[in-house]
From Swiss-Prot:
Residues 225-234 have a biased composition (Low complexity). Residues 1-26, 69-152, 181-234 are annotated as: Disordered. One of its GO terms (cellular component) is nucleus. This is Ninja-family protein Os07g0602900. It is found in: Nucleus. Keywords: Nucleus. GO terms for biological process: negative regulation of DNA-templated transcription; signal transduction. Residues 185-196 have a biased composition (Polar residues). Residues 70-79 have a biased composition (Gly residues). It comes from the Eukaryota. Residues 105-118 have a biased composition (Basic and acidic residues).
């Protein structure tokens, strides 16, 4: 190793001689490091004393209040003058993500929403209470009025009707279906007589008076209004209701002789003026015309289907 160093030093001249002198003064610490500093625990050949002797960078301070003062005047009054001459740093203002006005508006909006919800809830409660009070008043006035059986279809009538097709009429149709022309004339006259009947006046919300006041402002005494109970005294029993219903919609039947003939039962459904006669088939519940009713019984296309339909005046088992 010494021969190789002398050989390299001969090419370097004085530099080589100085290097050789330095190597002799350093001793064994300047040996060539062959580990390349690739160990996991650190560099084995690093000289810690040499690393500490290297000049280090002065760390700059990030705090504004700490500042380096020029070292020129030593101590005493000169140092005090420099300290007083340095301006004090301005305090940093903390920024806010939301301004105060926006926060107040948000709270105000929440209060308005809560008030609106309370108002809507109060209205719902008032509406529900008014409906309950109206029902209780109707129940306390006399219970279920018997007049409702005549004005509106009862459960008995709904159960007897096979399907809810077609339109009902407030007037009574013909009593039976004998001949086509006579049946239509009878139903037309009955409808006209029912339409000419005046409707009962309804009670006004104010109380006693139901009509409009005269021009001079004096109120005339009105006759007592007829109640639903007085109008429906004739239909107080279930037997009368069944009888009137059977008169409104009598039972009919059609019998056709032949291999395909059979007997079909049905009932004549209510119909209005200038409307076609409808018969409800009991077996299927379909609304059929007289021709379709006869054809349903197996009679085929006939010229006058009303002649093949028989009205049953006796009480039917379906009612």
């Amino acid at each position: 190793m010494a021969a190789s160093r002398d050989f390299l030093g001969g090419f370097g001249g004085e530099v080589g001689g100085a290097a050789v002198a330095g190597e002799k003064g350093g001793g064994e610490s300047d040996e060539i490091e062959l580990s390349l500093g690739l160990s996991l625990g650190g560099c084995f050949g690093a000289d810690l004393a040499r690393e500490f002797k290297k000049p280090r960078l002065v760390r700059s301070s990030s705090i504004a209040s700490i500042c380096s003062l020029p070292g020129g005047g030593g101590g005493g009054a000169g140092g005090d003058d420099v300290a007083t001459a340095a301006p004090a740093p301005a305090p940093l203002m903390r920024t806010s993500s939301l301004p105060t006005e926006t926060e107040e508006e948000r709270w105000r909006r929440r209060e308005m929403q809560s008030l609106k919800r309370l108002e809507a809830k109060r209205k719902r409660l008032e509406r529900r209470n008014s409906m309950n009070s109206g029902r209780s008043a109707g129940a306390g006035g006399g219970g279920r009025d018997d007049g409702q059986d005549a004005m509106y279809p009862t459960g008995f009538q709904l159960r007897r009707s096979v399907v809810s097709q077609g339109s009902t009429s407030s007037c009574m149709p013909e009593q039976g279906v004998g001949v086509g022309a006579e049946a239509m004339d009878t139903s037309s006259s009955d409808n006209a007589s029912c339409q000419n009947k005046p409707l009962p006046p309804t009670a006004s919300s104010g109380g006693g008076g139901g009509g409009r006041p005269p021009a001079n402002g004096s109120m005339k005494e009105q006759p007592p209004l007829r109640t639903l109970r007085s109008l429906t005294m004739r239909t107080t029993s279930t037997g009368d209701l069944r009888k009137s219903m059977m008169e409104d919609m009598p039972m009919v039947s059609s019998r056709v002789d032949g291999p395909n003939g059979r007997k079909i039962d049905g009932f004549l459904y209510k119909y209005r003026k200038r409307e076609e006669v409808r018969i409800v088939c009991v077996c299927h519940g379909n609304f059929l015309t007289p021709a379709e009713f006869v054809k349903h019984a197996g009679g085929g296309d006939v010229t006058n289907p009303l002649r093949h339909i028989v009205v049953n005046p006796s009480r039917s088992v379906f009612l």
